Amino acid sequence: APGGKTTQIAALAAEKARAGAADVRITACEMHAPRAEKLAYNLKRQGAHAVTVMRTDARRIDAFFRFDHILLDAPCTGSGTMRAHDPKAAARFTPHLLKKCAAAQRALLDRALTVLKPGGTMVYSTCSILPEENERAVREVLGRKEHADRFELLSPALPTFDADRLKAELPLLPCTMEEALCVRPTDAYEGFFMVKIRRVR
């Protein structure tokens, strides 16, 4: 880290390109200079040459840029990764942290939806299991006037798992957003949330 998910996306894109698909250009946004430099180094080391690292705050990315697909791996409280009886984790988790993360998530969602092309898809994910950072954030931003009736939620699926099988095999928490996945932390999994959104117009 950083760059694990970006490297996986680049590898999948390269595999599709070898199979005859069009070349793909990937943009990774990182606002903190040291992490941006490390991200660029890690990507180069992994041979992910199709990736451009943009050192910018994604909340302020210019509307000039338009994207076919977006992974918004939002900063969060990390509530899905906390272990029971971990005093350090408990000390970090405060109402102030939750409020700060929730505000950032909504701003990032708003901008990502703005720069997503019609017909494009976005995956919103966090390593939190709190509704305030997950389904509530998504509903609130999608309900804003500028986004109303422009987007739809899609059921999650992977190349080897359809949505029903995915939901059957993961330890899920109850979620008020039917299309989303909220995975319960276990010995085998860290907790996380994800939902896929498509821009219809």
Residue ranges of model-derived segments:
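S-adenosylmethionine
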Residues: 1-201
